[in-house]
């Protein structure tokens, strides 16, 4: 989750002191609601999805959506770039909030967008994907299991491009990605070729 403000700012200050120029972090709905990110200057921010998680905290879908929308309505500066997954039913609502602030919006999705997933083929150790960005196709091997991984990678690519990276170089790095421990992590391959995974995800 998003650290409390003092820890967050201390961590970012230490990163800057160590000449780290870029950072990525989660902007959790709890953290946004509790204003833990206030005062952090962001270049870009992304919206992945809106599900029924965390209703124990927010109580209503409206309050939960408003908390997430705070990332674009309050935290991301007017000159920031919003990367929005428009496959999610609330994606266009979030894009409208960002656009109303004057933020540049980059849309991502499987069914179209500025950056979209146009092909995907799975095997036992990962997937081959094709992304299209601004009329150009980029193919890559993702050593990650699960269709959702391509969705997450697509949004992450949008964020990195929004921060000024060359798109071709962004897509060239994808084969070097590693999985998060415990999230569809390839643990072993049996003698018969069957893959064994560890997965603690619970959405």
Residue spans for each PLM region:
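Short, glycine-rich nucleotide/cofactor-binding loops
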Residues: 195-203
């Amino acid at each position: 989750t998003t650290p409390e403000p003092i820890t967050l700012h201390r961590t970012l200050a230490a990163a800057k002191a160590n000449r780290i120029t870029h950072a990525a972090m989660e902007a959790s709905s709890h953290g946004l609601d509790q204003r833990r990110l206030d005062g952090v200057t962001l270049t870009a921010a992304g919206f992945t999805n809106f599900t029924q998680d965390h209703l124990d905290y927010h109580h209503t879908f409206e309050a939960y959506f408003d908390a997430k929308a705070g990332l674009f309505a309050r935290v991301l500066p007017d000159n920031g770039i919003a990367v929005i997954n428009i496959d999610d039913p609330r994606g266009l609502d979030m894009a409208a909030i960002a656009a109303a602030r004057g933020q540049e919006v980059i849309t991502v999705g499987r069914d179209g967008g500025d950056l979209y997933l146009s092909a995907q083929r799975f095997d036992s150790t990962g997937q081959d994907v094709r992304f299209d960005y601004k009329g150009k196709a980029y193919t890559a091997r993702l050593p990650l299991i699960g269709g959702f991984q391509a969705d997450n990678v697509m949004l992450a690519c949008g964020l990195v491009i929004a921060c000024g990276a060359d798109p071709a170089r962004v897509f060239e790095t994808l084969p070097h990605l590693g999985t998060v421990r415990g999230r569809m992590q390839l643990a072993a391959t049996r003698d018969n070729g069957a893959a064994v995974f560890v997965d603690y995800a619970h959405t």
